[in-house]
Amino acid sequence: MSFLKKWKTNWDLKSLTFDQLFDVIVTVVTKQLDELEKDEVTLEANLVIDFEADSVDVVAMLLYLEDMFKNASETTRTVVPTDKLGQIVLVEDILDIMYEVLLEIESKMDPFVKIKPDFDALEKQKKMGELYSNN
């Protein structure tokens, strides 16, 4: 199973532009990998080699994204797939997953309803590594 990357040739998402979705991804990556600056995150960046992320970081990023789009995903009973976790290498892989999830959500929603990321939900989340600390 590989990533489709349909968004590279045809952007079908109506609720968010490429730049808006990429900004959401960058915000999530820099929240989990807090030593990074937003301008360091590119589509081609390798999460493990360039940013020293591990599998817990990747899972955390997907959980943050799921939380940011929770209202729409719960309404449509759409979930972020976990079957591709082991294949996520690049930042664009995360974007690809979310693009496909958001397309699925849009296909199940009223066409006049826009999906909006909830940045407040992200702010309320603790960093994954802090969940089990005593701080």
Which residues are covered by each model-predicted region?
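Phosphopantetheine-dependent thiolation modules in NRPS/PKS and related acyl-activating systems
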Residues: 2-53, 57-63, 67, 71-135
